[in-house]
Amino acid sequence: MQKLIKKIREYLGLSQTDFAERLGVTFATVNRWENGRALPTKLAQTTLYEYCKVQSVPVYQMILDKIKTATEEISLEDGRTLLYHGSKSGIVGDITPKSREMCDFGRGFYMSTEPGQPLTLICDFEKSKFYIVSIDTRELSFVEIKADLDWAILVAYHRGRMEQIKGTSFYNKYSSIDTDKDLVIGSIANDRMFYVLDNFFTGSITDMALVNSLSALKLGKQYVATTEKACAAIRIEKEIPISMMERKFLQDESDANRQKGITLANDICKNYRREGKFFDEILDEAK
């Protein structure tokens, strides 16, 4: 956190003395923070968060820059792909496919090509950890799902929203897409997309509106290791500490992205109000 504090102060163009005065602490305290000899207390971090908000300091971008710098310091062998992972309580022991079963692509170890989504997923958890990881995909079986209606239906299957048509050819088609695969690669239902996708599942928007949302949002990709073999191919490259203050800014970013998703869904719904089919109509036709 010491580099971030210094970066904030320099962004504001303040000396350590002036910065300390703004935060209601001593020069020596700020000096210890920036030298890494002490960490700000929770109260001090809250004060710093509130001050940065008032001064419109781009802390979220600074967090991304910190991760980018750490990423650029990593050198990988051929065949390895660099990815990001967020954990609510940190990785202990071997990496295993042990997420909740009803995630986008079922139970697995989830990684992203972009840091933003795993960061906002863990921002509400005090003991959360952020990791830069890599995976060797050369010996793994995998399937890659394009960002289209098939992707949304596959997510619906894994989230348990298709049980009413279990046993149909339509259900079996999607239940078998990633069966026996070590790795599933597909778009991320991020903070913006989550609201749009939920609106599709609950019948508020059609498949046409959903597909156009997918195109507009330009979603990043996630890699999901669903087997022990795939998890054994993953290596932790770096752990990036995330402070309480940073988590507050990540919460703000998550809320803002969710609101953008709501706005987007509402706008697209107006344009495609009756074009296409609703989710329940798709399921009814499959019975």
Predicted features and spans:
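ADP-ribose/NAD+-binding catalytic cleft of ART/PARP-like enzymes
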Residues: 58-104, 123, 276-287
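A short, Lys/Arg-rich alpha-helix, primarily the initiator
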Residues: 1-11
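ADP-ribosyltransferase catalytic core
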Residues: 66-68, 73, 80, 97-107, ...
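Short alpha-helical DNA-recognition segment
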Residues: 13-31
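Active-site and NAD+-binding cores of ADP-ribose-processing enzymes
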Residues: 135-287
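DNA major-groove recognition helix of helix-turn-helix/homeodomain DNA-binding modules
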Residues: 10, 24, 41-61
